Amino acid sequence: MKLCVALDLSTKEECLQLAKELKNLDIWLKVGLRAYLRDGFKFIEELKKVDDFKIFLDLKFHDIPNTMADACEEVSKLGVDMINIHASAGKIAIQEVMTRLSKFSKRPLVLAVSALTSFDEENFFSIYRQKIEEAVINFSKISYENGLDGMVCSVFESKKIKEHTSSNFLTLTPGIRPFGETNDDQKRVANLAMARENLSDYIVVGRPIYKNENPRAVCEKILNKIHRKNISENDIEQNYEVIQQKEWDMCNHFEEWIKTRPDKEHALKEFYAKCGIKY
């Protein structure tokens, strides 16, 4: 699992300063529509000069097939490492994009946007007349069958997408709140344990990092958890929401429950199993 830091700050200077603070970390940077329109294509060059960051250019192209292919071709010339398009543009648009990018010796990864994480079921249904999960699976199959590299989706759809396509079909999951932060404008959010359990390949974290007084320390903490194969007893409190999400009703509070266990080691194994983590 890779960490992608969203550069969604108010000014280019703030974004570059954050990038400098995060030098030499094993991370990706996400450049969104706001930053790209404000700072232009040269902003990508400036970020690459700070460090050899992998760049995800998050512009979510959605237009007629030829226009989408033109746009994807142009941004691919910038040397970005990942771009995205809307799956709802259809298979012809997807095919044209991938045909156009096939001429590059090293093209960026191309992911499809399924359902924005700002959608809840009610709002999504009012537009698409489908449940989110049904639409996401349909979009994923179309994207996979027509040569895309993966999907942008919520954590809650990641594992199901792989089940209906391939374990190698990438999933990038926004809306990650690593330490239980507020949802802000996201509806379908999750924590690190959920992302791991649902096989996310990339997680996008923005505000919990750049709004912190020490962004680098937050990134290091996240990376430490990503690279840790198993969780320790110190992670129990931070993963309590996973227990709640699994509707584990052995007691009102996990801390109270584990105190009642004569064999703490066995209790921890049960905890790992409920979180979907190999002990």
Swiss-Prot record:
Spell out the GO cellular component terms annotated for this protein, sorted alphabetically and separated by semicolons.
cytosol
- Pathway terms, separated by semicolons: Pyrimidine metabolism; UMP biosynthesis via de novo pathway; UMP from orotate: step 2/2
Q: Which residues bind substrate?
A: 8, 30, 58-67, 117, 177, 186, 206-207
Instruction: Cite the EC number.
Output: 4.1.1.23
One Pfam family from the record: OMPdecase
State the source organism's domain of life: Bacteria
The catalytic activity, as recorded, is: orotidine 5'-phosphate + H(+) = UMP + CO2
Q: What GO MF annotations does this protein's record show?
A: orotidine-5'-phosphate decarboxylase activity
User: Keywords, A to Z?
Assistant: Decarboxylase, Lyase, Pyrimidine biosynthesis
Report the active site residues: K60
Lyase keyword on record: yes
Biological process according to GO: 'de novo' pyrimidine nucleobase biosynthetic process; 'de novo' UMP biosynthetic process
What NCBIfam families does the record point to? PRK00230.1, pyrF
Q: How does it assemble?
A: Homodimer.
Q: What does this protein do?
A: Catalyzes the decarboxylation of orotidine 5'-monophosphate (OMP) to uridine 5'-monophosphate (UMP).
* Family affiliation: Belongs to the OMP decarboxylase family. Type 1 subfamily.
Output this protein's name. Orotidine 5'-phosphate decarboxylase
What's the source species for this entry?
Answer: Campylobacter jejuni subsp. jejuni serotype O:2 (strain ATCC 700819 / NCTC 11168)
